[in-house]
């Protein structure tokens, strides 16, 4: 759309108008105090409160955002939406104030501990006065806790402590469904992941299956009702979860943000497989994906490539919640019918 109709442009116009009103308020106060000329200008610079500007501006805006800005007088501000859709973390001491959308960036850059970094709460703003004072002010009342799940699942750095544990848990929770699909035949099932960002969820899935296998070993030993022989014990302990690096991504490309016609052509050349990694016609192949959006790569490339290994069964699982609605996280996905979940529902 034309630039003048974009949300950022409208927000800047509204904020500029409110800033003018804040300057006007201080101008009147300065005159009432008997100040003139340069003294009025200095008074305005020292008394403009960005929290007043934000309170009157941001109440009219909807959706997820972290807005950052700088005024001509040196006031800096960062504000998070009251629904908590977009993430924001900050660190401040006597020398620096810094804000980012992800905690690991701050930890790595400034060698900080997890506990050193604060989350900017929904509806709050981090303000840096022109004199260097940094404060956090409540601008709008919190209206919910609706963190963007797609950002946490796909875009966020997997090195974040919370994100890492979440992704592992999402993978582990798939254990019962996968067991049912493979008829509990772990001995003839190989586990792998696609794409590379699904690796953490893959470890979670493996953890779930390792727990299951260990429980089965304990039950088999207890069922003997006696001390097992060396051969029996060796047979029981031989059961394990098989994992392989089956798929290899040749180029670092994300097909879901590629333009329509180029997307299908690109998807067919993204992956290759490790030949000989499974027993043809004998092994099931379980592949975990961390986010299936349109399913373009899945349909155009992955399933065809995996089939070259001749597995007994291919099981595709996704650790992500279903992506059901357009314009998710602002990505250009305007049509509902593009989504893999929508197409699968219609097919069923």
State each model region's role.
Residues 1, 191, 198-205, 209, ...:
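Extended, hydrophobic alpha-helical segments in both membrane/secreted and soluble proteins
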Residues 132-148, 193-232:
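Terminal amphipathic helices with adjacent charged low-complexity linkers/tails
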């Amino acid at each position: 759309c034309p630039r003048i109709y974009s949300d950022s442009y409208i927000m800047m116009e509204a904020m500029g108008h409110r800033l003018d009103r804040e300057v006007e308020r201080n101008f009147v106060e300065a005159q009432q105090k008997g100040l003139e000329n340069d003294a009025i200008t200095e008074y305005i610079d020292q008394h403009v409160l960005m929290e007043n500007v934000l309170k009157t501006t941001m109440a009219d805006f909807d959706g997820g955002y972290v807005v950052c800005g700088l005024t001509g007088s040196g006031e800096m501000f960062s504000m998070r939406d009251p629904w908590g859709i977009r993430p924001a973390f900050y660190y401040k001491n006597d020398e620096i104030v810094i804000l980012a959308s992800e905690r690991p960036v701050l930890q790595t850059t400034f060698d900080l501990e997890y506990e050193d970094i604060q989350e900017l709460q929904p509806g709050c703003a981090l303000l840096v006065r022109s004199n260097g004072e940094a404060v956090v002010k409540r601008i709008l009342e919190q209206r919910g806790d609706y963190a963007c799940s797609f950002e946490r699942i796909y875009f966020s750095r997997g090195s974040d402590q919370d994100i890492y544990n979440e992704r592992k848990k999402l993978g582990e929770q798939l254990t019962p469904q996968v067991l049912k699909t493979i008829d509990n035949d772990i001995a003839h099932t190989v586990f792998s992941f696609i794409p590379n960002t699904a690796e953490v969820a893959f470890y979670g899935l493996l953890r779930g299956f390792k727990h299951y296998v260990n429980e089965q070993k304990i039950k088999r030993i207890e069922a003997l009702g006696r001390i097992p022989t060396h051969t029996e014990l060796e047979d029981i302990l031989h059961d394990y979860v098989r994992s392989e690096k089956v798929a290899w991504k040749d180029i670092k490309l994300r097909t879901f943000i590629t333009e329509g016609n180029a997307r299908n052509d690109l998807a067919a050349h993204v992956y290759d497989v490790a030949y000989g990694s499974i027993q043809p016609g004998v092994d099931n192949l379980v592949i975990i994906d961390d986010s299936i959006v349109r399913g373009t790569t899945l349909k155009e490339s992955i399933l065809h490539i995996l089939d070259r290994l001749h597995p007994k069964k291919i099981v595709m699982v996704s650790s992500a919640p279903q992506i059901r609605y357009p314009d998710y996280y602002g990505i250009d996905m305007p049509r509902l019918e593009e989504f893999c979940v929508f197409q699968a529902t219609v097919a069923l």
